[in-house]
């Protein structure tokens, strides 16, 4: 199944979760903190403005991005869980 985000929405694949703590302790599933960075998988056409024009997206497919801990909604695509969020929920692009 393919998903094409609409307007200013972005589909993000979350980065892998850390399996160990900073002190070297192996973390179980419930103790692992979900990373707040990932890779852009798909983008919409941009935000529609009141005057009818479309504001182009700043992010593109392949960008590594930072986002808030509670940003986006999880969506299941095939056997993979991705995040759908608005571009404004993205805090920055990792260079």
Swiss-Prot record:
Family matches, as CDD domains: cpn10 (cd00320)
Name the species this protein comes from.
Francisella tularensis subsp. tularensis (strain SCHU S4 / Schu 4)
Protein known as: Co-chaperonin GroES
Read off the Gene3D superfamilies from this record.
GroES chaperonin
InterPro entries cross-referenced by the UniProt entry: Chaperonin_GroES, Chaperonin_GroES_sf, Chaprnonin_Cpn10_CS, GroES-like_sf
* Compartments where found: Cytoplasm
What Pfam families would the database entry show? Cpn10
User: So which domain of life are we looking at?
Assistant: Bacteria
- What are the annotated GO cellular component locations? cytoplasm
**The protein's role, per its UniProt record:** Together with the chaperonin GroEL, plays an essential role in assisting protein folding. The GroEL-GroES system forms a nano-cage that allows encapsulation of the non-native substrate proteins and provides a physical environment optimized to promote and accelerate protein folding. GroES binds to the apical surface of the GroEL ring, thereby capping the opening of the GroEL channel.
Protein family? Belongs to the GroES chaperonin family.
Tell me a GO biological process for this protein.
chaperone cofactor-dependent protein refolding
This protein's assembly is summarised as:
Heptamer of 7 subunits arranged in a ring. Interacts with the chaperonin GroEL.
What gene codes for this chain? groES
Question: From the Swiss-Prot or TrEMBL record, what is one GO molecular function term?
Answer: protein-folding chaperone binding
């Amino acid at each position: 199944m393919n998903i094409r985000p609409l307007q200013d929405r972005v589909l993000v694949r979350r980065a892998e979760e850390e399996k160990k703590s900073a002190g070297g302790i192996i973390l179980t599933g419930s103790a692992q903190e979900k990373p707040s960075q990932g890779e852009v998988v798909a983008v919409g056409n941009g935000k529609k403005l009141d005057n009818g024009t479309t504001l182009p997206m700043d992010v593109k497919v392949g960008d590594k991005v930072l986002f808030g801990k509670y940003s986006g909604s999880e969506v299941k695509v095939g056997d993979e869980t991705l995040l759908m969020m608005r571009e404004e929920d993205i805090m920055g692009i990792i260079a």
